Design a protein with these regions (language model features):
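Secretory targeting and sorting signals
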Residues: 1-25
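Periplasmic/luminal catalytic loop of GT-C fold multi-pass membrane glycosyltransferases
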Residues: 118
Length: 440
């Protein structure tokens, strides 16, 4: 085990200069802004302190991170609605009710009631549609519908079922963010809270035209192995998809694909994988890697953190198979999405956000450890790191030190909520709608 070495905090500042925009102009088109899930907006214009600007109540809780496309803020609710808002004022421009959500009483377990659109939508600049998945019932059966909506008008242009094959749709939850790349929209699936029923972690892909057959990859386990974490699939420099997988059925014998990092081709063939040597034990005690997504650094490494408090550094070009990590070290238990600025990864640890720098040899260095109340999935912009506490607080942190520079009260959020950065504003999804905070 490699020890975590404390480095000079100024490294964090230099890392902030390397922001990944991935061609999404000055909007926010997907979870954490770009397909690599950097969570960095180098164009955010925040000077001085921020203050509450507006709050708009919607028809349900907002678990998904809001998007900003062409000057319209797009929010998705657990009432299966998509909204277009004015990001400057919060005024509602349009509302599209995709379907009727599923009552918790219909489901075998779970902790969202009702269950509608949970995963963060994604915008496709080619079709000019925002894609979202709505959970609903058709003919008395639970199903998942992929909707494609014009972000300017709210007009729905695509609607098709995208249930994971070989799994019970009633036990399958679409929590992870959608990913758009290579002319397809990718939809990850895990299970409901409680891991009940016959589900297996799956990624389903549809053409962005909404036509043609679906393709899919399913974790080769008897059950579980969820691909559930909010960031969804990450796209690497070669256009392949990276996912982290939760605990699966096997606790002895042959590895069955769980507790892992998987690399999938655009047509969803398995290309490469990593699993800790402790995968069987991790599966047995629910201490797997499925609670976050892969964090790609600028120098060619991948940092994978999960529930067990062990962080693994992998080579992005060769994941290493079972036990093939570059380093493994004790860091923290982490849930949600990281932010990545250059070679610095901001990790949403359950005992407080950490900034970790990965050097040219793959060795990790803890730069700072924030206040224990700062646990939300971070984003970076305007000279600050932004994070939420679900009890109702927005934090702005100094990226050099992790010190809290500002704490603002707000409505409660879901556990994995993450803010969106746009223009001079921080836009926050809450259990009642959207709240905006603006720089002075």
């Amino acid at each position: 085990m490699t020890s975590w070495r404390r480095a000079v905090p100024a490294v964090a500042l230099s890392a902030l200069a390397v922001a990944t925009t991935a061609g999404c102009d000055n909007g926010w088109w997907t979870y954490h802004r770009d397909p690599v899930r950097s969570g960095v907006d180098s164009q955010l214009a925040v000077a001085g302190r921020v203050s509450a600007a507006w709050t708009t109540n919607l028809d349900g809780a907002v678990y998904a991170q809001p998007l900003v496309v062409g000057g319209t803020l797009v929010a998705a609710t657990e009432n299966d609605s998509l909204y277009g808002l004015d990001p400057g004022t919060g005024a509602v421009r349009w509302r599209t009710h995709v379907a009727s959500p599923v009552s918790r009483s219909v489901l075998p377990c779970g902790n969202i009631d009702p269950l509608g659109i949970t995963g963060t939508p994604a915008y496709d600049p080619t079709s000019k549609l925002v894609f979202a998945v709505a959970e609903t019932q058709l003919g008395g059966k639970v199903t998942h519908l992929l909707a494609g909506v014009d972000p300017a008008s709210g007009q729905q242009r695509i609607l098709r079922p995208v249930d994971p094959p070989g799994s019970d749709p009633t036990a399958s939850q679409q929590r992870g963010a959608l990913t758009v790349t290579a002319g397809r929209v990718y939809v990850p699936y895990g299970g409901l809270a409680g891991d009940c029923g016959a589900y297996r972690g799956t990624v389903v892909a549809s053409s962005t035209t909404g036509t043609g057959p679906l393709i899919s990859y399913t974790v080769p386990t008897a059950r579980e192995g969820g691909i559930w974490t909010p960031p969804g699939p990450v796209v690497d420099r070669s256009g392949n998809l990276l996912v982290q997988v939760g605990n699966s059925a096997a606790t002895a014998g042959a590895w069955d694909g769980g507790d892992s990092v998987l690399k999938l081709s655009p047509d969803l063939r398995l290309l490469d994988s990593f699993a800790p040597a402790s995968w069987a034990w991790d599966n047995a005690v629910d201490a797997d890697l499925g609670s976050t997504a892969p964090s790609l650094t600028a120098n060619g490494y991948l940092l994978a953190v999960g529930k067990s408090s062990t962080a693994y550094t992998l080579r992005a070009g060769h994941l290493g198979g079972i036990g093939g990590q570059v380093t493994s070290s004790q860091l923290c238990a982490a849930y949600g999405g990281t932010a990545v600025a250059g070679n610095t990864v901001y990790v949403p640890c359950t005992d407080g956000l950490r900034a970790v720098s990965v050097d040219s040899a793959g060795a990790p260095h803890v730069l700072w450890h924030a206040n224990t109340a700062v646990t939300g999935s971070p984003v970076v912009g305007g000279g600050r790191v932004w994070s939420l506490n679900p009890s109702g607080a927005l934090y702005g942190l100094d990226p050099r030190t992790g010190a809290v520079t500002q704490q603002l009260p707000m409505n409660q959020t879901s556990r994995f909520a993450s803010p969106t950065l746009f223009s001079d504003s921080v836009l926050v999804p809450t259990l009642t709608g959207i709240s905006a905070f603006r720089g002075a």
